[in-house]
Amino acid sequence: MFEKWAVALADQIKKINPEETEPHDVLVFGFTILFNLLFTFLLLLIVGWIIGVPLLTVEVTLSFMILRILTGGAHLDRSIACSITSSLLVLTFVWLPVSPILLFCYFVVSLMLIARFAPYYEPHQIKHSKQWEQKKKRAAILWVIFTFVIYYIFSAPGFVFGALLQALLLTPAGIKFIHKLNNFTMKGGEYCEKSG
């Protein structure tokens, strides 16, 4: 769905100004990511509001997205599957129990998992220099520490929840789960007929 919109928009931009724009595939990739993020964020805002936890939902989402950028992770091939999966995972994590001891445990587990497993990139993804990845990993660890400080000062647990979600997805079990989900979402349908 998003891919079709991205292709259509990239086609229009290339028709308007073919000389001064990025290559078509770069435009499609960028627009697909943009549409995916907007859809996911809008969906989470709406559902968070409906279930009565809009601020908590935004906290979890922002923390998850920041760490995802810093630490990578397994990916789904279809952007709509990515949006739906991300939304379901975030909405599951807003229901985690809250207490000072539990939040400290979530924080410690997140810190340990990110220190151990980050970064993760799929084989087809571009890997940056080791120095750059170490800087991103340090930034991720600082972010996790910052999430606990936010919880401690402002009683906002969602940032810790988002960190835990991303940390769990970096584990071998989390990566295996996403890969199995990707295989499931790719079976049958128009998309697989075109690519297979």
Feature locations, PLM:
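Short, highly charged, low-complexity non-transmembrane loops/tails of multi-pass membrane proteins
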Residues: 178-196
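Hydrophobic core segments of alpha-helical transmembrane domains in multi-pass membrane proteins
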Residues: 56-65, 103-113, 158-169
